[in-house]
């Protein structure tokens, strides 16, 4: 009987810790679609993002960054594109569990070669931050919620 109570209490304690951590460790998702190359300089990369709800907090900062790299002879063509939004500007995507599609334009680094049709590597990351608006003016105070996601190198075809 004593063993059953101890196991039950330990199980409930683990469940309570899991539920408490679940409120702060949100899962955000990000997927990269098939990119489109224009004029060998711009690559439009479609991304799909899902941000989980943040309760009564206010989302104040969001960012999606996409990197493209491609072998170009003995050099590497590369570029980075970023979408960013900060309160009070409109957000990039809602944090309500719904899926949102966005396009990130990546420009080739002018110090290197241009992109070309063929295989390339795309990686991406995203973040969303939420907090409680400060009662003393601008800014946000605790509690905070931050969701991060990374997409490791994915091979795609530019064309």
Report each predicted region and the residues it spans.
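Short, surface-exposed binding/anchoring microloops in extracellular/periplasmic proteins
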Residues: 28-75
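Short proline/glycine- and polar residue-rich coil/turn motifs
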Residues: 39, 84-100
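Short beta-strand elements
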Residues: 131-159
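Secretory targeting and sorting signals
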Residues: 1-27
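Hydrophobic beta-strand positions in extracellular immunoglobulin-like domains
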Residues: 48-51, 68, 106-108, 126-128
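Aromatic sugar-binding surface patches on proteins
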Residues: 43, 94-111
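Surface-exposed loop/edge segments in extracytoplasmic proteins
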Residues: 72-85
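Short glycine/proline/serine/threonine-rich loop/turn segments at secondary-structure transition edges
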Residues: 108-122
């Amino acid at each position: 009987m004593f063993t059953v109570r101890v196991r039950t209490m330990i199980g409930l304690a683990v469940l309570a810790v899991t539920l408490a951590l679940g409120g702060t460790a949100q899962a955000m998702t990000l997927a990269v679609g098939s990119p489109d190359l224009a004029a060998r300089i711009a690559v439009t990369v479609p991304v799909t993002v899902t941000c989980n709800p943040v309760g009564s907090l206010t989302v104040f900062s969001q960012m999606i960054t996409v990197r493209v790299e491609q072998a170009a002879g003995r050099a590497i063509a590369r570029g980075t594109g970023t979408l960013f939004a900060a309160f009070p500007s409109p957000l990039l995507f809602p944090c309500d569990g719904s899926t949102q599609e966005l396009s990130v334009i990546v420009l080739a680094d002018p110090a290197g070669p241009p992109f070309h049709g063929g295989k390339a590597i795309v990686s991406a990351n995203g973040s969303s931050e939420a907090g409680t608006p400060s009662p003393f003016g601008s800014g946000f105070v605790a509690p905070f919620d931050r969701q991060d996601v990374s997409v490791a190198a994915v091979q795609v075809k530019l064309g």
